[in-house]
Amino acid sequence: MAEVLVYVDHVDGAVRKPTLELLTLARRIGEPVAVALGNGAADTAATLAEHGAVKVLTHDASEYADYLVVPKVDALQAAHEAVSPAAVLVPSSAEGKEIAARLALRLGSGIITDAVDLEAGDEGPVATQSVFAASFTTKSRVSKGTPVITVKPNSAAVEAAPAAGAVEALSVTFSAQATGTKVTGRTPRESTGRPELTEAAIVVSGGRGVNGAENFAIIEALADSLGAAVGASRAAVDAGWYPHTNQVGQTGKSVSPQLYIASGISGAIQHRAGMQTSKTIVAINKDAEAPIFDLVDYGVVGDLFDVVPALTEEIKARKG
């Protein structure tokens, strides 16, 4: 069976959930070979093996932390030369999509971004994408070179499948471009205790209808009662009510949680583009004609200032 390269997203050896989802999808089309880079790379091996990696290629160098994405592209290119894989899978984060695009260019290959499913095909892996605000589902394959595919978080359930997970050192020669853009400093974000927006199983978002930064407290309260991440529409972000890092939509982040609750969001196509692949969508809006209701599984026509606090209290009561 052909091998499939999986780029590992980890923090000092702690593997992030989207990578485990990639391993599940990779097993459908071949044998997963994980590529772990940077500090703690070797510490990822046990987790990766538990979830199906037959091999774990590791390489640690200061360049991965000191410079932007090019060193990681160099490493993936080296892994591609060592393995000759059937495909390369990368998490569909902002960094992941840049890595994938640069790698595809170097390999002279095609790229598919924001896939929500993956299956084996007679002529190579077939990726499913949700497009035009979930109006259509497309199936695509790369017709030239090794397919490079980014997959959206929450596209697959994480499934354990113990494998050998043999650790091998990857030999990497960095290109001249690798050190072209140096990281001069990092400012840690203040922790809210909530899950990462793009990885959360539940997302509660507020829009123009929240009508003020101070009113986002009721959105946060509902999110905290559910253990959810907080999102915001572009209108809310542009008004200065919530940080841009929490914006969901075409010019923000793309999410695909199990449950998405839209409060006071009309449902412009730009917002829908960022949450259309959510498994279950609930909308709360006092305008019964709001476009968001065309997309939802469950809709509540009502004032969010009445509905959201009542929902929060009911959830708390049921949780005891």
Which residues fall in each region the model found?
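N-terminal glycine-rich FAD/FM-binding segment characteristic of electron-transfer flavoproteins
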Residues: 1-320
